Amino acid sequence: GITDLYGVMYKPFDFDSSKVYPIIEYVYPGPQTEAVNSSWSKSMNRVDRLAQLGFIVVTVGNRGGHPDRSKWYHNFGYGNLRDYGLEDKKVTVQQLAAKYKFIDGNKVGIHGHSGGGFMSTAAILFYPHFFKAAVSCAGNHDNNIYNNWWSEQHHGLLEEVNEKGDTTFKYNIATNQSLAANLRGHLLLVTGDIDNNVHPGNTIRVINALIRANKRFDILLLPGQRHSFSDMDEYFFWKMADHFCKYLIGDYRNETDINQMHND
């Protein structure tokens, strides 16, 4: 069948429909919610503010997302916690690029935080020829070492009963590091060094796998930061901006100092 997906598109304030823009997806896979804003706020760094640098930024739901849609929609990812939303993210860009001439479907970025960090890394590794750049923050890249109240609840356990009637449960969720050899695009991994929600070990496991696969990638470690980046969030924004501008627009003329941070 056909499943409608709902989302929001953010454009630069000086948008010109005769121009062609790279597209970035801001993602959060759920399954308890989706990263689709229903209102405006002054803190929209990852969507509206990012668009002002010359991007089309979209947030769109995916099957396996918000439970208000339906029980089937919400449960779509059960048993496949890594991959369930990736196809919808790819198809979203393909359909939008086919519909709107101002979207460059060959210059696609993806970004997310926490579950979105997990998803954005999975996307650039699962579809390495499609997603050209990713910024992945505080991602639970290995849900086998993440909180069981999240991973077990949303992925499930495999129940096995032996001949004696004894029941055992097996728990094995596909990880991002297992896909490290697939990397072709440009990946920036970001984590706080004292994240007390998603342990930095999740990101370190991906780093280890990428190094052993002889891949070039970038890392941003934010000292003293937990799951949110607090007083380093502005610095993070400009590092994310540099990454996408360099690899999707080709504009990388910035000096060592981030002069924008000195503006009032």
Model region roles, listed by residue range:
Residues 1-264:
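Serine-hydrolase catalytic core recognition
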